[in-house]
Amino acid sequence: MRALAKLAPEEGLTLVDRPVPEPGPGEILVRVEAASICGTDLHIWKWDAWARGRIRPPLVTGHEFSGVVEAVGPGVRRPQVGDHVSLESHIVCHACPACRTGNYHVCLNTQILGVDRDGGFAEYVVVPAENAWVNPKDLPFEVAAILEPFGNAVHTVYAGSGVSGKSVLITGAGPIGLMAAMVVRASGAGPILVSDPNPYRLAFARPYADRLVNPLEEDLLEVVRRVTGSGVEVLLEFSGNEAAIHQGLMALIPGGEARILGIPSDPIRFDLAGELVMRGITAFGIAGRRLWQTWMQGTALVYSGRVDLSPLLTHRLPLSRYREAFGLLASGQAVKVILDPKA
């Protein structure tokens, strides 16, 4: 089979031939039909400081994908051969304190597909059966491939007291920020403001936002106060940008909620008293997806048609054109780029 792998501790990836793996006890073999490139994959491609500290080549990359169950290992009752599945990328231990208290999404021994073990940029992949989410067979594989990152957006939106009837600011209109805008709109929030300095991506938020803000052209805090009269009740932070984080926190009304998924590339400084404590701000750190509550919430939105993820699928390319695909995503002139492992 063909697979896209990190073979050496250096920039880039390589298209390789590998034997089709066989599922062991509790595992399934998935024939991958669609795979999506994530920002994490870009880090691995660039071989930046994070990748150098985490990735151990050789490794087949990719953790956002969908496909068909081709075979099951001993002891597997579900899913069954022929099922269409999306994959939860976090493999958890079930034994650490986090898992034992139901916080599987922050398992102390998490292994991530395509990061810590072979992932989905391949024609076939073996995964734990428990990591498969069975989809209706009429759900397009391209949409099914991005249910995993969609879960990050769903988790962020529904953390804390939710968003229904609340004013919301979204900082960062990358793929997950845009997905969050869809969920926020479908959940009855308003007014909704979305901020991002990339005009291409910001435009994708137009159907879901009451106000778009390019912070390079307008004062975000001034716009927020003009639209809301005082500030927003909820901040959803996806950018990981230090300036955006500070602006977002100060855009909150006293007593507001900040839900932060964006990860800064370097540690940042902030005024704990002035930005959080004395203003009564509640901050939530969001990691991954709650297992399996987030999957239930997210698929309910997608299966019912309340959220349509297809507008975010901007490019579809064969796996053989992976260099072009990664270049598109790195340029900022794409949202979700889908790879077809069979082509």
Curated annotation (Swiss-Prot):
Zn(2+) 2 binds at residues 93, 96, 99, 107. It holds the Pfam family ADH_N. The record marks 148 as: Important for catalytic activity for the proton relay mechanism but does not participate directly in the coordination of zinc atom. The active site is at 40 (charge relay system), 43 (charge relay system). GO terms for cellular component: cytoplasm. Pathway: Amino-acid degradation; L-threonine degradation via oxydo-reductase pathway; glycine from L-threonine: step 1/2. Transmembrane segments: none annotated. InterPro entries: ADH-like_C, ADH-like_N, ADH_Zn_CS, GroES-like_sf, L-Threonine_3-DHase, NAD(P)-bd_dom_sf, PKS_ER, Zn_alcohol_dh. The keyword Metal-binding applies. It catalyses: L-threonine + NAD(+) = (2S)-2-amino-3-oxobutanoate + NADH + H(+). SMART domains: PKS_ER (SM00829). Its main location: cytoplasm. It is found in: Cytoplasm. It comes from the Bacteria. Binds 2 Zn(2+) ions per subunit. Contains one structural ion and one catalytic ion that may be less tightly bound at the site. Its EC number is 1.1.1.103. Keywords: Cytoplasm, Metal-binding, NAD, Oxidoreductase, Zinc. Belongs to the zinc-containing alcohol dehydrogenase family. Catalyzes the NAD(+)-dependent oxidation of L-threonine to 2-amino-3-ketobutyrate. HAMAP family: Thr_dehydrog (MF_00627). This is L-threonine 3-dehydrogenase. It comes from Thermus thermophilus (strain ATCC 27634 / DSM 579 / HB8). The lineage of its organism: Bacteria, Thermotogati, Deinococcota, Deinococci, Thermales. The gene is tdh.
